[in-house]
Amino acid sequence: SGSSVSSAGDINSDGFDDLIIGASNASPDGIENAGSSYVVYGKTLFNKELNLSNLNGRNGFRLDGAMKYDQSGASISSAGDINGDGFDDLVIVSSDSVLLNGIYYSASINVVFGKSSGFSASFNLSDLDGKSGFRLIDLEGSDAVAKTAGDINGDGFDDLIVSNSFADPNDIENSGSSYVVFGRSSGFDATFDLSSLDGSNGF
């Protein structure tokens, strides 16, 4: 663990900021290199050591990659509050999702919505359904990063910025692209294709 680390914001809105720790080469439940990310809830007092295997849903939880070689947790960050529900959200990059939208070895971006309670000890990113979060697809290559962009259009919802250095815009090989996805209160599907950005939902 510790291949990537970040503040997670306050995903359960208890007044304490939380941590997220990536382990992109982990093999949860025997799924080779699916990757895992660990969320540790903030609180007033900690022991001098914390074993991540002891996260139980009350003190934090584990997020597992959707498939073999997913390498989820390669990049992790707070996503701000994308859906404006008062809970900070998480963004987790899967760097080598084997097949997404016809592109082999392409990255995908997983957004997990925060909430006050109800996280189990582990959650598989394949279970994101639009209500619990969603996955951004149509990224070329394995090199992608996503971060909160703040509220760039002033609608009260935090937005997400995604960089993809291996993208080929206008047939210019590996010249790279960045995408902004606007936050909103509802209407997220389980997957969102970045090629559908049209100016009203991002650009």
Q: Which residues are covered by each model-predicted region?
A:
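Conserved beta-strand/short-helix segments
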Residues: 1-203
